[in-house]
Amino acid sequence: MTTPAAPRRPFFRRRKTCPFSGPNAPKIDYKDTRLLSRYISERGKIVPSRITAVSAKKQRELAQAIKRARFLGLLPYVIR
């Protein structure tokens, strides 16, 4: 006869904090291609916020900055 095991708590993954919020967080600027390229996939697509843990407001700013940099030719639209 076996004894009942203690009930398991469900696995809780802690939400990462937004890298653009905080006292010394970097500003999102369309001219900062090194920062923007960290949020673009290998194929040139904008990485979703559920992967990068960027807040919704900052994700919109980030997407606008990436699109602006693409339009000005600072970032590529597609990476082959």
From Swiss-Prot:
<dbReference type="GO" id="GO:0070181">
    <property type="term" value="F:small ribosomal subunit rRNA binding"/>
</dbReference>
<dbReference type="InterPro" id="IPR036870">
    <property type="entry name" value="Ribosomal_bS18_sf"/>
</dbReference>
<comment type="function">
    <text>Binds as a heterodimer with protein bS6 to the central domain of the 16S rRNA, where it helps stabilize the platform of the 30S subunit.</text>
</comment>
<keyword id="KW-0689">Ribosomal protein</keyword>
<dbReference type="GO" id="GO:0022627">
    <property type="term" value="C:cytosolic small ribosomal subunit"/>
</dbReference>
<dbReference type="Pfam" id="PF01084">
    <property type="entry name" value="Ribosomal_S18"/>
</dbReference>
<dbReference type="InterPro" id="IPR001648">
    <property type="entry name" value="Ribosomal_bS18"/>
</dbReference>
<dbReference type="GO" id="GO:0003735">
    <property type="term" value="F:structural constituent of ribosome"/>
</dbReference>
<comment type="similarity">
    <text>Belongs to the bacterial ribosomal protein bS18 family.</text>
</comment>
<protein>
    <recommendedName>
        <fullName>Small ribosomal subunit protein bS18</fullName>
    </recommendedName>
</protein>
<dbReference type="InterPro" id="IPR018275">
    <property type="entry name" value="Ribosomal_bS18_CS"/>
</dbReference>
<keyword id="KW-0687">Ribonucleoprotein</keyword>
<comment type="subunit">
    <text>Part of the 30S ribosomal subunit. Forms a tight heterodimer with protein bS6.</text>
</comment>
<dbReference type="GO" id="GO:0006412">
    <property type="term" value="P:translation"/>
</dbReference>
<keyword id="KW-0694">RNA-binding</keyword>
<keyword id="KW-0699">rRNA-binding</keyword>
